[in-house]
């Protein structure tokens, strides 16, 4: 009788627990599947007129008027000698990038954004910027920066109603890249490969790096201690695959298969679009400057010189977007 009672009790417990287990799994699945970027409705341009800027060098947080902050970004990220429509495009891109960070809560717990270009956007104060320009250029240069920000006030780039993650870089080397090809992860539909003409006339277009064989081996071993290469054998360095934008996706070096992005990081190359020439020394010939995702700054300047306005420049580099007033 006692055994029958225990059996019935166990059966009741099993019947009770099974629905709970399945319900928990379903709840977790739904949370993951409904994760989305925050919509534009979460940001009120009139209400949030200030931004909290983290200064990486000091660790201090400064609160600034948003458009005052953007003046420091535009004059730091793009040469004032560039065409006015390129500067306007940079202002809209910077404003969009900033608002995207505010809405989606960036990496910094107590600040909206930082002044490190490798993490967020570069920034410099007006006083510092003016001191770095020659006295004869200061007034005209600052007027161009102010015009770029003020004439585009409140304008941002949106895709399907939401601010985009507006990546930009210095020089695409003739073609931009998808975000997935560079960082993996999310595929942003507005960050596609597009062509740009006229970038080869800029100093950022090409560069070289020459290292000894010993330094080449040493650099890679810093990241991969098991690295082996025999330069006396053929095909010790072989490009296996290119990205759609023409950068190296995968490359075989000795006993390793590495990504072009990793080689770029190891040797601090300006781009993942490169060739390697092996002789007594190793020569990297590099095309472009930066990750290649989103707007090319020199490409924007080239397009402006060809008569394109800032909205045309933006819509060229960001596929299927709209310019929206907030």
Annotate the PLM regions.
Residues 23-63:
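N-terminal, intrinsically disordered, polar/charged segments of Gram-positive cell-envelope systems
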């Amino acid at each position: 009788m006692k055994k029958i009672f225990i059996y019935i009790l166990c059966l009741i417990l099993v019947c009770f627990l099974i629905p709970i287990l399945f319900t928990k799994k379903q709840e977790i699945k739904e949370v993951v599947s409904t994760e989305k970027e925050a919509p534009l409705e979460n940001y009120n341009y009139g209400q949030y007129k200030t931004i909290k800027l983290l200064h990486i060098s000091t660790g201090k947080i400064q609160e600034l008027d948003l458009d005052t902050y953007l003046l420091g970004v535009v004059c730091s990220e793009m040469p004032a000698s560039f065409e006015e429509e390129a500067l306007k495009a940079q202002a809209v891109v910077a404003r969009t990038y900033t608002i995207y960070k505010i809405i989606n809560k960036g990496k910094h717990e107590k600040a909206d954004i930082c002044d490190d270009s490798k993490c967020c956007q570069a920034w410099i104060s007006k006083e510092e910027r003016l001191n770095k320009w020659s006295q004869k250029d200061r007034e005209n240069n600052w007027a161009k920066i102010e015009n770029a920000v003020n004439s585009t006030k409140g304008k941002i780039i949106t895709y399907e109603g939401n601010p985009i993650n507006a990546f930009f870089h210095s020089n695409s080397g003739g073609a931009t890249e998808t975000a997935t090809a560079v960082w993996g992860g999310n595929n942003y539909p507005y960050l596609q490969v597009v062509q740009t003409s006229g970038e080869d006339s800029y100093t950022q277009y090409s560069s070289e790096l020459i290292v000894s064989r010993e330094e080449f081996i040493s650099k890679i071993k810093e990241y991969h201690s098991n690295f082996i290469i025999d330069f006396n054998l053929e095909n010790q360095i072989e490009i296996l695959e290119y990205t759609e934008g023409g950068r190296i996706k995968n490359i075989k070096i000795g006993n390793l298969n590495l990504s072009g992005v990793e080689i770029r990081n190891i040797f601090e190359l300006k781009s993942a679009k490169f060739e390697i020439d092996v002789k007594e020394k190793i020569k990297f010939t590099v095309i472009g400057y930066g990750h290649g995702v989103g707007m090319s700054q020199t490409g924007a300047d080239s397009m402006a010189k060809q008569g394109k306005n800032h909205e045309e420049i933006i819509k060229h580099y960001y596929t299927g977007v709209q310019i929206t007033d907030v």
